Amino acid sequence: MKTLKRKTGIIKIVSISFIILFASAVLGACAKNEIIDEQNTKDNLPTPDLPYTIVGTNQLSCFDNTKEISAPSVGEEFYGQNALYNENQGSYTDNTDGTITDNITGLMWQKNAGDKMTYDEAVNGASSFDLSGYTDWRLPTIKELYSLIIFSGIDPSGYNGSSTTGLIPFIDTDYFDFEYGNPNDDKRIIDSQFATSSLDVGDSNFGGGNLMFGVNFADGRIKGYPTGAMPGQPEGKTFFVLYVRGNQNYGINEFVENSNATITDNATGLMWTKDDSGTGMNWQQALEYAEGKEFAGYSDWRLPNIKELQSIVDYLRSPGSSNSAAIDPVFNCTEITNEGGQKDYPYYWSGTTHANMQNGGNAAYISFGRALGYFNGSWQDVHGAGAQRSDPKVGDATNWPTGHGPQGDAIRINNFVRLVRNVN
């Protein structure tokens, strides 16, 4: 009995100690939460309803295969394009201290990119960057930076003038400072590439390899850019940089595979088809395919806009590194043989027109396989799996046997489709 009492006494002491420790932990956690809440309030950063809300493209005009048109009605040609599904348009707050808050994503941005810097300078500069009293800035991922792109811009590629008057960039200049490349400094007008922390994991040797996915807000594209000096060049390429802070969950998917061959992304609120179209088609056919599709009990499928489509890219996967498309393996991607004779994966259409100086003849796509170009006499992955470029909406791809543009981008026209719908 004495032993039992002694043990009971020990248990009581331990229990009291545990209660004190537990209470201290709870109080500490509450205090920590209060500090976090106080910090969030001080930062005035909104908490998004979904951690990875896709910001709209700001594409308000409709297009046919070549030009702007009046908005088509249900059942008419070219119905189903981006401008007819216009949601979550950008909303920013200028904090008047050199920072911009994105009210949709919960991210805070540097307003003015300042001078260009090398990639190493961009990476190393984040830890010492201090703006408006905040020191937790980071170099954005490609998905964070792409949240800023808008497709009310006009691609000036091929423009030979030096004046930027009348040109429209692919970023909201009501809030962000922006400048085109300066031809007087031996730069192209379109040399306005912005750096990210996202590197290409593929097998590209373009520019000596080691590509970084950057956003060009002058011409409205994602491409892989060499992080160091190009072969034969004394210096590496330089980039603009917009550091970011807040919402560290932005760009992280939460895929759930449903039992009906659909995939729900709980981070974005979008549902996708597990399988793609299985065959390529031109842009108008892609719109018709999406609008006419009834699948898994749903009839509200559509062609995704380019920012929705980019949201499901997995930049840690590629044909060269994982022997797969740049997408979570929960999805199925049709295998193709590319222009260079390699096993590869398709380009996928979006409903977003990529307007240029010749109006609306191109639409934006994402390359879930190698972003091929004909460069220095051979087909190679010039921009990396996950690049966003554009193709003519209609035509014969054989008219571009060596691609198009400075890096000879492969023109296919008959691209694949993956359908999307809103969960709610």
Q: Model-derived features: where do they sit?
A:
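N-terminal secretory signal peptides that target proteins for export/translocation
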Residues: 1-11
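Compositionally biased, intrinsically disordered low-complexity regions
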Residues: 7, 19, 60-63
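Sec-dependent N-terminal signal peptides
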Residues: 9-21
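C-terminal motif of bacterial Sec signal peptides marking the signal peptidase cleavage site
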Residues: 25-29
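Glycine-aromatic-enriched surface loops/turns that form tight recognition elements
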Residues: 30-138, 143-301, 307-424
